[in-house]
C-alpha cells in the first residue's frame, strides 16, 4: 500500500512525496538518469530529442532503471501506487498508439515532459502495456503525477484509461479515485477549529481540548481511511515559505498515514510497514528520503551530480 501527496509554495514550486508501504524491500536506492543517458523504450515510444534529467527512488533490473517515484528538473513528478483488483492492462502493443511499458512509465513521463498539462494531452494516444519483469509479479498500479500547479491520477482499467484531475492532491490505493473523492463527502463536517461550548438541556458542555472538531476522521491504515486522513492534513496544513519548512510539511503530512510494524497483516501473514518516505522539491531540485529503520531525512540534490553524463548514477544510501 502507498500514499502520495503534492502541494506548492507561494512561488509555485512543487513539493511531491510518497510513502511506500510493503513487507519487504526491493533494494531500492536513489537513481539519477542524466540527460545524456541513452534509453531505448521497450516499444519505441517517442520523446524529447534532448530528454530531461531525472532523479528518484528505484531499482535497476535488466540494465534498466525502474523508478517507484521520480521527478525532473522542471518540477514534474510521478509515483506509482498499488492498485490491485482494478488495474487492467493489455500485454501486447496496440497499433496506432504510443505504447509504453508499465515499468518504464514513470521514467518516460519525467524524461519527456515538463508539465502535467503536457502529460495529460499526450495520454490521449498512449497505451500502457504490462511487461512482466522476469522473476517478478505483474505490477498492478495507478499513477499520481504532479507539478507546481496541479496533479492528476492515471488509472488503466478494463474499460480504458481514466485520467482524473486531483483537486485534493493526494492518492492512496484501491478502490478507484472516484470512490475516494465521493467518500470525502462523509467527512464534510470535520473541522480543525476549536469546538464552541454548547448546552444540552441544563448541561453545559465544553471541549476537552484541541482536536474535538476532528472527531470522525478514521484512524486505521486501510486505503480509504488513509486517503481521508492525508487529504485532511494536506488541506489544512498552514502555508510555508522556505525549503526546510516545506520539506518538514511534506514528511509530517506523510507521517500522518505511515504504517508501523505489527499494525496490519497482509494476505501472506507478513506485516506491512512504511519502508521509506521520499519527497522532491523543485525549488532546489532536491530529492529527500528516509527509511523505516533510519528516520533521518537525507537529501540528494541534482546539482551534486553530472546531469549531462551518459552514465546511470546509483547513489548508495
From Swiss-Prot:
Known regulation of activity: Hydrolase activity is competitively inhibited by the products cholate (CA) and deoxycholate (DCA), and by phenylacetate and 4-aminophenylacetate. Penicillin V and penicillin G show mixed inhibition. Strongly inhibited by thiol enzyme inhibitors in vitro.
A GO BP entry: bile acid biosynthetic process
Name listed for the protein in its UniProt record: Bile salt hydrolase/transferase
Active site residues according to the UniProt entry: 2 (nucleophile)
Record field: catalytic activity: glycocholate + H2O = cholate + glycine; glycodeoxycholate + H2O = deoxycholate + glycine; chenodeoxycholate + glycine = glycochenodeoxycholate + H2O; cholate + taurine = taurocholate + H2O
pH dependence: Optimum pH is 6 for the hydrolase activity. Highly active in the pH range 5-7. Is stable at pH values from 4 to 8. At pH values above 8 and below 4 the enzyme is rapidly inactivated.
Gene Ontology CC annotation, any one: peptidoglycan-based cell wall
Effect seen on changing residue 3 to A: About 2-fold decrease in hydrolase activity, but no change in substrate affinity
Matching PANTHER family: CHOLOYLGLYCINE HYDROLASE (PTHR35527), HYDROLASE (PTHR35527:SF2)
EC number(s) recorded for this UniProt protein: 2.3.1.-, 3.5.1.74, 3.5.1.24, 3.5.1.-
Subunit structure, interactors included: Homotetramer. The tetramer consists of a dimer of dimers.
Positions that bind taurine: 82
Thermal dependence of catalysis: Optimum temperature is 40-45 degrees Celsius for the hydrolase activity. Is stable at temperatures from 4 to 37 degrees Celsius. During 30 minutes of incubation at 40 degrees Celsius, about 20 to 30% of the activity is lost, and at 50 degrees Celsius only 20% of the activity is retained.
Biological or metabolic pathway of the protein: Lipid metabolism; bile acid biosynthesis
Gene3D superfamilies: Penicillin V Acylase, Chain A
Induction: Is part of an operon containing at least two genes, bsh and glnE (GlnE is glutamine synthetase adenylyltransferase).
This protein's record includes keyword Cell wall biogenesis/degradation: no
Keywords (A to Z) from UniProt: Hydrolase, Lipid metabolism, Transferase
Function statement: Possesses dual functions in bile acid metabolism. Acts as a bile salt hydrolase that catalyzes the deconjugation of glycine- and taurine-linked bile salts, which occurs naturally in the intestines of humans, releasing amino acid residues and deconjugated bile salts (bile acids). Can hydrolyze the amide bond in all six major human conjugated bile salts, namely glycocholate (GCA), glycodeoxycholate (GDCA), glycochenodeoxycholate (GCDCA), taurocholate (TCA), taurodeoxycholate (TDCA) and taurochenodeoxycholate (TCDCA). Shows a slight preference for glycine-conjugated bile acids as substrates.
Family of the protein in this entry: Belongs to the peptidase C59 family.
SUPFAM superfamilies (alphabetical): N-terminal nucleophile aminohydrolases (Ntn hydrolases)
Domain of life (superkingdom): Bacteria
Record-listed deoxycholate binding positions: 2, 18
One GO MF term attached to the UniProt entry: chenodeoxycholoyltaurine hydrolase activity
Amino acid at each position: 500500500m502507498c500514499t502520495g501527496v503534492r502541494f506548492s509554495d507561494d512561488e509555485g514550486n512543487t513539493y511531491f512525496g510518497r510513502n511506500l508501504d510493503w513487507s519487504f524491500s526491493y533494494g531500492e536506492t536513489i537513481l539519477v538518469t542524466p540527460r545524456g543517458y541513452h534509453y531505448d523504450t521497450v516499444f519505441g515510444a517517442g520523446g524529447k530529442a534532448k530528454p530531461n534529467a531525472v532523479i528518484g527512488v528505484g531499482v535497476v533490473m535488466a540494465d534498466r532503471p525502474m523508478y517507484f517515484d521520480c521527478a525532473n528538473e522542471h518540477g514534474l513528478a510521478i509515483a506509482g501506487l498499488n492498485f490491485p483488483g482494478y488495474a487492467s492492462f493489455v500485454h501486447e502493443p496496440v497499433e496506432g498508439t504510443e505504447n509504453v511499458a508499465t515499468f518504464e512509465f514513470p521514467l518516460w513521463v519525467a524524461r519527456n515532459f515538463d508539465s502535467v498539462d503536457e502529460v495529460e494531452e499526450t495520454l490521449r494516444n498512449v497505451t500502457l502495456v504490462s511487461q512482466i519483469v522476469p522473476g517478478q509479479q505483474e505490477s498492478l498500479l495507478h499513477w499520481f503525477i504532479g507539478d507546481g500547479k496541479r496533479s492528476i491520477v492515471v488509472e488503466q482499467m478494463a474499460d480504458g484509461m481514466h485520467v482524473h484531475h486531483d483537486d485534493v492532491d493526494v492518492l492512496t490505493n484501491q478502490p478507484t479515485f472516484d470512490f475516494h473523492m465521493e467518500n470525502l463527502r462523509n467527512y464534510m463536517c470535520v473541522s480543525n477549529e476549536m469546538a464552541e461550548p454548547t448546552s444540552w438541556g441544563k448541561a453545559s458542555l465544553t471541549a476537552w481540548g484541541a482536536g474535538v472538531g476532528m472527531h470522525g476522521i478514521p484512524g486505521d491504515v486501510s486505503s480509504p481511511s488513509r486517503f481521508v486522513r492525508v487529504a485532511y492534513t494536506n488541506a489544512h496544513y498552514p502555508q510555508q515559505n522556505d525549503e526546510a519548512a516545506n520539506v518538514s510539511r511534506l514528511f509530517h503530512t506523510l507521517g500522518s498515514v505511515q504504517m508501523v510494524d505489527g499494525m496490519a497483516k497482509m494476505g501472506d501473514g507478513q506485516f506491512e510497514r512504511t519502508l521509506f518516505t521520499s519527497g522532491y522539491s523543485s525549488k532546489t531540485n532536491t530529492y529527500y528520503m528516509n527509511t523505516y529503520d533510519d528516520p533521518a531525512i537525507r537529501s540528494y540534490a541534482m546539482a551534486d551530480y553530472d546531469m549531462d553524463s551518459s552514465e546511470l548514477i546509483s547513489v548508495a544510501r
